[in-house]
Amino acid sequence: TFNNTKIFKGTYGIIPEGPFVPLPEEIIDLEGVVKKNYFVEPLLRVQWVGEPVLKDDGTFEVQVKITRGTDNPDYQQPLEEAWLFVSQIDYVSNAPGAYSTKLSTNLTQADLRNYTLGDILTIRTGYPNGWNGGTGDPQKIDGSYKRPYFLRFGARTSKSFSSIKRYNFTDV
């Protein structure tokens, strides 16, 4: 959703950008309120399988499934990277400050080389036994620590748009 209340009356070229098959530019005459809906083909579809499980060592284990979102072969590059993002705020993404670098888990292309699209992938959050290896750090994720944590999984291919490789995400 995009809402900009500071655009002046005039003719504008609109190009939606994201981790999806690109759409052509649309020329729009803006005068007053304009509502536009765009339907896109994501590069990947990423979905949770079941619920996160809190393990005895204080980590969370999750399962996800990644599938292609488009049949267009020009946008079916191999998986390049995936993350299980963990955050203490409900807006979880790959943006700076929107995830914990200590608790999130990164899967590189090498980690994903044996993964087949459509299969279930099991991932754990980082730092078993809490930060510092379970030395009593109060940031440990366990049932006695009441601060909420939010999880989100994102995966991306090697395809870049405007020099940016973009993630497709699960919900939070």
Q: Where do the PLM segments sit?
A:
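Solvent-exposed loop/turn segments flanking beta-strands in beta-repeat/beta-sandwich domains
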Residues: 69-104
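Beta-sandwich strand segments
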Residues: 20-27, 74-76, 160-169
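Solvent-exposed serine/threonine-rich low-complexity stretches and specific carbohydrate-binding patches
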Residues: 1, 95-126, 170
